[in-house]
Amino acid sequence: MFIQLLILSYAILLQLIATQVADKQLPNLTKQCEPTSQTIYDFHVPTLDGSEKSLAEYRGKVLLLVNVATYCAYTFQYNDFNPMLENNSNGTLKILAFPCNQFLLQEPAENHELLNGLKYVRPGNGWEPHGNMHIFGKVEVNGDDHHPLYKFLKEHCPQTVPIIGDRHQLMYNPIGTNDIIWNFEKFLIDKKGHPRYRFHPSAWVQGSVIAPFIDELEREI
């Protein structure tokens, strides 16, 4: 019995070490998604003009999905999106942005106002999205009315931090343990439509945190 317990303890220790090593291979505030046979191609999302668009139109592309807001401390990241896409010479990368007003009401604009807000207010200075960046209609990413796409992403990609935030800043119910934590959280999708990585809003540094993961997925067949 003692030997069996010793072997079991050793096996558990090896598993813990393997898990710790795997975690250390990822930057802080980055999580790997769980494998799933379902893809984002099963979903339709609202556009700025009120119509619906199938995400199946993005087959074969590496996708960076991000929930955005105009009046957020992370809004400066918009200034990094266009250079990131310009440097993607093969055009494989697409950025899909989903405006959301659930975090301290930092996206109050109506759909028809969003692009002008970005152009003239924040980030301002005439900012317009690159041709490979698509800004969709407003959605909810948490709570009872979360969009099915975000329900799917949260089910298969673990939370990047143990604490979500202050309750009074979250404009939805109920609060879930795997909720989107704030504006500009990101999901990286491979060329077959599977979610692969989840990134905390602050895991950015002008896109340099995410760039190696994009390169990895672009190399995949």
Curated annotation (Swiss-Prot):
Keyword check for Signal: yes
Domain of life of the organism encoding this protein: Eukaryota
GO MF: glutathione peroxidase activity
GO terms for cellular component: extracellular region
Entry keyword set: Glycoprotein, Oxidoreductase, Peroxidase, Secreted, Signal
Glycosylation: residue positions: N28, N87, N90
InterPro entries: Glutathione_peroxidase (IPR000889), GPX_AS (IPR029759), GPX_CS (IPR029760), Thioredoxin-like_sf (IPR036249)
Protein's cellular compartments: Secreted, Extracellular space
EC number(s) given by UniProt: 1.11.1.9
Gene Ontology process terms (BP): response to oxidative stress
Top-level class of the enzyme under EC nomenclature: oxidoreductase
Reaction(s) catalysed by this chain's protein: 2 glutathione + H2O2 = glutathione disulfide + 2 H2O
Entries under PROSITE patterns matching the protein: GLUTATHIONE_PEROXID_1 (PS00460), GLUTATHIONE_PEROXID_2 (PS00763), GLUTATHIONE_PEROXID_3 (PS51355)
Catalytic site: C72
Signal peptide location: 1-19
Chief localization: secreted
Subunit structure: Homotetramer.
Sequence similarity: Belongs to the glutathione peroxidase family.
The name this protein goes by in its record: Glutathione peroxidase
Organism: Dirofilaria immitis (Canine heartworm)
Organismal lineage: Eukaryota, Metazoa, Ecdysozoa, Nematoda, Chromadorea
